[in-house]
Each structure stands twice: as C-alpha cells, then as structure tokens.
Regions:
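Acidic, low-complexity intrinsically disordered segments
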Residues: 2-3, 45-100
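A generic structural signal for solvent-exposed, polar alpha-helical segments
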Residues: 19, 38-40, 57, 65
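Short acidic/polar mixed-charge low-complexity motifs
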Residues: 11, 41-44
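Short aromatic-centered micro-motifs
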Residues: 6, 38, 50
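Negatively charged, low-complexity tracts enriched in Asp/Glu with abundant Ser/Thr
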Residues: 1-29
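A short beta-strand signature
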Residues: 30-41
Length: 100
C-alpha cells in the first residue's frame, strides 16, 4: 500500500492506507472499505474510514472492479485520497467516515 504526502495550507500530512475489505456477496463486489491513517510526521491525527462503491471505481477505470488487485488498489486509494484531501482543506484531519 502506498502512502501519499499531501500539503494543505503549508502543513504536510501523510495518508497511510490500511488493508482493504470487500462487501460479502455471491456476485461481484459492490463496495470496498478501508481505513486511512492521517499523520503529521509520526503523530496520528485521525483515521478516515473510507467506503468506495463499484460505480465510482468503474467510472474511473472500467477494468478495475473485476481486475487484479494491482489494478484495483490504486483506483481505490486515489478516490479515497481525493475525499480526504478535500476534508483536510476544510480543516478536518480527525476521525470520520467518508464515501467515494
């Protein structure tokens, strides 16, 4: 899993994604969930619990939802990071649930 550094108003945050879980279904997965730790250096400021839906993933990359994890993972992370960065710009580094 790839960390990302984000700069907001002169402050650098590190986004540290954790393991992914998929929705339990007999059909194709419709939802993926994972946590992203928001760090200021080594200090944890919050945990963003992110849920990303199949439609969002398909819109970004049509092959990703049913593709191998190395294709799916970057799309999931990118969608979550975009939401988290927007929340950081609004001054919200703490714990919360986000949907993408």
């Amino acid at each position: 899993m790839t960390q990302r550094q984000v700069e907001v108003d002169g402050q650098t945050f590190t986004l540290d994604p954790q393991g992914i879980r998929t929705s339990l279904t007999d059909g194709p997965p419709m939802l993926w969930g994972f946590q992203v730790r928001v760090l200021d250096g080594e200090r944890e400021l919050g945990i963003k619990t992110c849920f990303v839906g199949r439609v969002s993933v398909q819109f970004r990359d049509a092959s990703a939802p049913d593709g191998p994890i190395d294709v799916l993972l970057p799309v999931l992370h990118e969608l979550a990071f975009e939401k988290i960065e927007a929340r950081l710009r609004e001054g919200e580094p703490g714990d919360e649930i986000l949907f993408a």
